[in-house]
């Protein structure tokens, strides 16, 4: 259906209380990459929220394909799958949500800035801290105020167009970007903040860790300061739509510039892993095994 024909109840608890989850990913040649992993994370989150929803990969892949074709996007596209708790009336529930709403949206991939994957982009340190997850593991939930506040803070700075913002934990440790996970190379290791910092367990983050290990790079998850990032040999961010984006400019709270040792071009490790990621995305069947 067209966007104008879509309807959600005013009593849907996704609307009233933010009870819902979503997954964002992309297609390569019409095939959703790592779909099974996205659906697994979605199903686990629904169980945490007591939303009765078990995704069917085959049915959803067909639905994504039809929606993409209806939008004239049979090849590469941006996909968002949302599951909302459904109609629950006014008041907080005590039981399970039995009739969730499912929504698939497809749009063109956002255009990347010229030279983005060769020359990289700016990563700006923000004052907005990454909030503490409401449950043991951060869910990709409809509660997005923290990220919106961070996005607005970034927009109010003099950061370069296309820059990403970096949030720290409440105790000042590296967390994640507004819409991305963070990686860096130091002392010969590929490093990324650990999940106990409260970051989202990103699907692309998970795959990049696997690719790095398979390529023979030592990997480590941990807790590091902003100063550790300033000493890094390479820095990049990951998400399912933008893939791996090199960071070649680091800027502090008031815009003071600092540069990773890799300078103003993508470093060798991120170039290698991006090539492997794209090869994997292009050759892998849509149902990840």
Per-segment meaning from a language model:
Residues 1-166, 170-173, 209-289:
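Conserved alpha/beta cores of soluble small-molecule-handling proteins
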Residues 125, 200-201:
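Short beta-strand/loop turn elements enriched in aromatics
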Residues 165, 173-195, 201:
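Glycine- and Gly-Pro-enriched alpha-helical subdomains that act as flexible
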Residues 197, 208:
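Catalytic subdomain that performs nucleotidyl-dependent activation
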Residues 202-207:
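Feature captures the catalytic cores and cofactor-binding loops of soluble hydro-lyases/lyases
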